[in-house]
C-alpha cells in the first residue's frame, strides 16, 4: 500500500506439506457415479498477513491469489475432482515476535 509491496520479500514464508491422513466427502462414491475415478483431491491455502493493510488490499490479495490458484490447478481439475480453499487471516496476535536477518537482504539502500 502507498507504493510499498503488499508482501515484502523478506517477510514472505511458504510452507507446503501433504496430509498423511485425510478424508474427502463421501469417499469417492459421487465421483465414481459421475464417471470419475472417485479419487478426490483438495488444496487448502491459508495466507496469514499482519495487521495494517486496508480491507481493499486484503480483498485484492484474495482475488489475485484465487485467480492464480484457479489457473494453476485448472489442468488438474480437468482430469479429476478437486476442491480448492483459500482463506486469509489477518493477525490478531496476542504475541508476535520476529527475529530475522533476512529482511536486510531486501532493503534498498
Regions found by a protein language model. Give the residues of each.
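A short amphipathic beta-strand at an alpha->beta junction
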Residues: 10-14, 75-93
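Mobile acidic interaction elements
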Residues: 50, 62, 89-93, 108
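Short glycine/threonine-rich loop-to-helix capping motif typified by GTGT followed
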Residues: 22-29, 94-96
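Mid-chain, well-packed structural core segment of small domains
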Residues: 26-28, 32-76
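Short, glycine- and small/hydrophobic-rich beta-strand elements in well-ordered beta-sheets
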Residues: 5-24
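Generic "edge-of-domain/loop-turn" microfeature
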Residues: 21, 52-54, 93
